Amino acid sequence: MEGEAVEAIVEESETFIKGKERKTYQRRREGGQEEDACHLPQNQTDGGEVVQDVNSSVQMVMMEQLDPTLLQMKTEVMEGTVAPEAEAAVDDTQIITLQVVNMEEQPINIGELQLVQVPVPVTVPVATTSVEELQGAYENEVSKEGLAESEPMICHTLPLPEGFQVVKVGANGEVETLEQGELPPQEDPSWQKDPDYQPPAKKTKKTKKSKLRYTEEGKDVDVSVYDFEEEQQEGLLSEVNAEKVVGNMKPPKPTKIKKKGVKKTFQCELCSYTCPRRSNLDRHMKSHTDERPHKCHLCGRAFRTVTLLRNHLNTHTGTRPHKCPDCDMAFVTSGELVRHRRYKHTHEKPFKCSMCDYASVEVSKLKRHIRSHTGERPFQCSLCSYASRDTYKLKRHMRTHSGEKPYECYICHARFTQSGTMKMHILQKHTENVAKFHCPHCDTVIARKSDLGVHLRKQHSYIEQGKKCRYCDAVFHERYALIQHQKSHKNEKRFKCDQCDYACRQERHMIMHKRTHTGEKPYACSHCDKTFRQKQLLDMHFKRYHDPNFVPAAFVCSKCGKTFTRRNTMARHADNCAGPDGVEGENGGETKKSKRGRKRKMRSKKEDSSDSENAEPDLDDNEEEEEPAVEIEPEPEPQPQPQPQPQPQPVAPAPPPAKKRRGRPPGRTNQPKQNQPTAIIQVEDQNTGAIENIIVEVKKEPDAEPAEGEEEEAQAAPADAPNGDLTPEMILSMMDR
């Protein structure tokens, strides 16, 4: 049953297509007169006159129907035996004339003469003459008075069949018989082409050859005329079958109008399309309209042409008439077959880019590639500012607005907007469930067999014209080998400076480096006089100093919250940042607190040095001021308090760690180092009365944590000697020693 249903659909489709083709053929027949002036109407009725006026003021009238008696008479005349009855019959038969038709004056379009056939009465007596002597001419002359100066004179020369005489019909209907002397020369080259033609024995006076001529924009153009010479073998008019002329009433096929040096083309008024034929232009104009007259009787879809409808019907019936000669595949359209052979068999890429070496199988891909040179993005998104070079990417982008996800994972049923995203999902999430195809030439593993075929064709196929490495002179005939070779140049510093030891991997880096030697700064600011070696520096300068809307980027330290304008500065700070709690920085760096303390010490150092230079010395003869001796010692850092003991014993304290003493105390850099503070005491000897100077070294107790009971004494000690002077108790104790 299914087979019968398919056959019924096929028969119905063929009947439908044939009906469409007949209607289309009839419409083309009716409108084909405008396409070519030399084409004659295909359907005529017996005895009917078809006159077609297409911007023409001259029409040629010829005999449509030949009487059978006339054909028989013509044969007898050629053989030399003509019966009197036949002569009488010919007297009352037909005559071929050329009549002037007065038309309305309008510009004459070149090459738009039409031949039509009408029956006319014939009253011409025939004498016993040969065929050669009956060669005549029809002259259709239009007086110059009736035409404008720009309109051409048209002359048409034809050979006469036997049994006819040439007459001239005037504008008012008067008939004038042409004499033999007025006939055109017999040596026209167009007559000599006929194999049955024999040159006349008697030479006649030579006159100018009569041709159909017209003028186009001041240039004379020759036009070939119709040739109606007789053929003895078939007894027909030249180049026309007599049975078709008499039975079907179809006129002979005209020759094409040939213009010397002029090629007529038709151009679309709506775009830049050009074509050599009017029918092609008419078919193209349908692409600018929404007219789709051809509808499918199965699904209702409409198409512009019958060819598109036929291809569509093949999709219903499953017919694939176009078979590939190189494999077993078949296609619905011829375009699909051509594209298949180029991709699979011939690898031909006829569409080449004029700006680079790119070549493509399809012209649409070439147009898309050319937009990469011009930067044109004609396909604009109506919802945002996105623009694309082709419609495919625009459709893919529109899914981000619509939320459509047409691609579904067959394992977990997750949906995606792009097929590539779905493939990556399958490879990453469902690797154990995916069939793996290993490339036999490399280590590549591919999930789909079709993708493996693409990989083999692109990476491992043999290239007849080898490709050269862009880094060296090596040539490879395989793309994969070329890529692997170029990877060996990736980390190679091939560009070396000829003025220093600098080397780099990229040429652009070397160009920028050489500007440090030459001092060249080609990038100048348009708002000030600054120049730069790199364009990035110019852009940064312009944004920072000349752009009022510029907001500098803030790089915040994650430890202390401090902001920086440059990332590398922030990274350098973060390596040694102590954080908000004052914890020592990483990699053994100084803490934030210690850095600030050091800055304060350096400031106080400068102040002390300036004060010491400006201060005047004020020293007594007997003693020296030792004020700095007490204050120079830095305050000891707090240490954990030990457990108190009931009876503390003086114990020599351990030396403080080196880490606790950093830097030099302020105001002591230019002074000589003093080991211990000293004091001069004058003592008078009671026996002799001499005065002796005793130098006393003040030994300061090392810093130690006092006990709880000794805190008050330690705090009161500085009050006794605020300036560091020796008290009397100290002097007496030293004298006792």
From Swiss-Prot:
Pfam families: zf-C2H2, zf-C2H2_16
Zinc finger (C2H2-type): 266-288, 294-316, 322-345, 351-373, 379-401, 407-430, 437-460, 467-489, 495-517, 523-546, 555-577
Residue positions, PTM N-acetylmethionine: M1
Post-translational modification: Sumoylated on Lys-74 and Lys-699; sumoylation of CTCF contributes to the repressive function of CTCF on the MYC P2 promoter.
Coiled coil: none
Biased composition (Polar residues): 668-687
Biased composition (Pro residues): 637-657
A GO MF term: DNA binding
Keyword NADP attributed: no
Subcellular localization, as worded in the UniProt entry: Nucleus, Nucleoplasm; Chromosome; Chromosome, Centromere
Any one GO biological process: heart development
Domain of life: Eukaryota
Residues carrying Phosphothreonine: T289, T317, T374
Chain residue numbers at which the record places covalent cross-link Glycyl lysine isopeptide (Lys-Gly) (interchain with G-Cter in SUMO2): K18, K219, K699
Assigned protein family: Belongs to the CTCF zinc-finger protein family.
Subunit: Interacts with CHD8. Interacts with LLPH. Interacts with CENPE. Interacts with BRD2; promoting BRD2 recruitment to chromatin.
PANTHER family, A to Z: GASTRULA ZINC FINGER PROTEIN XLCGF49.1-LIKE-RELATED, PR DOMAIN ZINC FINGER PROTEIN
Free-text function comment from the UniProt entry: Chromatin binding factor that binds to DNA sequence specific sites and regulates the 3D structure of chromatin. Binds together strands of DNA, thus forming chromatin loops, and anchors DNA to cellular structures, such as the nuclear lamina. Defines the boundaries between active and heterochromatic DNA via binding to chromatin insulators, thereby preventing interaction between promoter and nearby enhancers and silencers. Plays a critical role in the epigenetic regulation. Participates in the allele-specific gene expression at the imprinted IGF2/H19 gene locus.
Protein name: Transcriptional repressor CTCF
